């Protein structure tokens, strides 16, 4: 677990191109694109400054993490998707300093104690939570699933409400 590094705002562009291929993440998500990367691989980023500090996001590939983000990687005994859901559920913002500019430090985050189940259970839990996450946050899969659920609900109530034969008997 470590903090990202400073990069000048003048080095960040809004649109990805051949000379700025790497996403640049700050404490609250994607800031833009840069020429260089300082991290590589699947990671979790935790926002460390501002009112939204403590938010957690999954990133992968080559990217640049600014000083406003804490970068953490999984270990063999920890499923990164499980860790994402656990950290998100923990509401890390509650551990932020109570100042004009709330903040989290790597030191404070690394002292938090959590219980981690066996890796097989982590995979199972992460798989279930990932499915729910997709259904609730991804319009391409969530919306059709919601429409299908409402269609079934409609058919159920339609069949119940329009079954006059049962009422006459």
Predicted stretch roles:
Residues 1-169:
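Charged, alpha-helix-forming regions
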């Amino acid at each position: 677990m470590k903090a990202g590094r400073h990069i000048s705002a003048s080095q960040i562009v809004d649109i990805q191109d051949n000379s700025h291929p790497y996403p640049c993440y700050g404490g609250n998500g994607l800031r833009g694109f840069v020429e260089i990367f300082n991290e590589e691989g699947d990671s979790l980023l935790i926002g460390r400054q501002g009112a939204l500090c403590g938010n957690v996001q999954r990133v992968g590939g080559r990217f640049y993490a600014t000083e406003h983000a804490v970068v953490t990687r999984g270990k063999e005994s920890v499923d990164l998707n499980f860790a994402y859901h656990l950290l998100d559920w923990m509401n890390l913002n509650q551990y932020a300093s109570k100042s004009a500019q709330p903040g989290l430090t790597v030191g404070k985050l690394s002292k938090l104690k959590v219980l981690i189940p066996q890796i097989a259970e982590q995979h199972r839990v992460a798989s279930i939570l990932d499915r729910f996450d997709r259904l609730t946050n991804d319009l391409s899969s969530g919306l059709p699933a919601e429409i299908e659920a409402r269609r079934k609900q409609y058919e159920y109530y339609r069949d119940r409400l329009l079954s006059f034969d049962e009422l006459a008997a």
